[in-house]
Amino acid sequence: EPGRSRDNPAKALFLSRRQVTKPGSEKETWHIEFNLEQAGLDYVVGDSFGVFAANDLGLVDQIIAMLGASHTTAVNGKTLREVLLNDVSLSPAPDTLFELISFVTGGAQREKARALASGDDPDGDAANLDVLAALQKFSGVRPHPEAFIEALEPLQPRLYSISSSHNATPGKLSLTVDAVRYVI
């Protein structure tokens, strides 16, 4: 049944987003609405609504350039660009990526990649390494695109608590979302 699992999602049409809090407030809260008329879903306040977000195209293209690959390279029946946009997480860099890097490099770089793969932080920057930063850190390394994709984690949906009632606004789902920003 569509919309009941990550393997069979329902499509929702984005309707609107408006800021609930005043600009400059300590908190940044948004009211977001989706049209679910075509999805045929029932829900109650407090149910979860999962959103599969796409990765940033600019970031994806930078990663493809670092790999020295073409965006049209075939991976798992899709283009490399499609897989990087929609199927894998680009942050943080997983231990399996550093393990892959350790297999295709040598010397000090191999030791550093092995340390990162085992959870150590030889340069004190592991907390800041997303996939692009990891490739930049090991800039001479160009793993094969298929192996690279296999080393990444699947993109997870972002789950939000529904703040509207299907009975009050049939076909229209509302979320109340607090923006969280980190400065590293």
For each predicted feature, which ranges?
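FNR-like FAD-binding dehydrogenase module
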Residues: 1-184
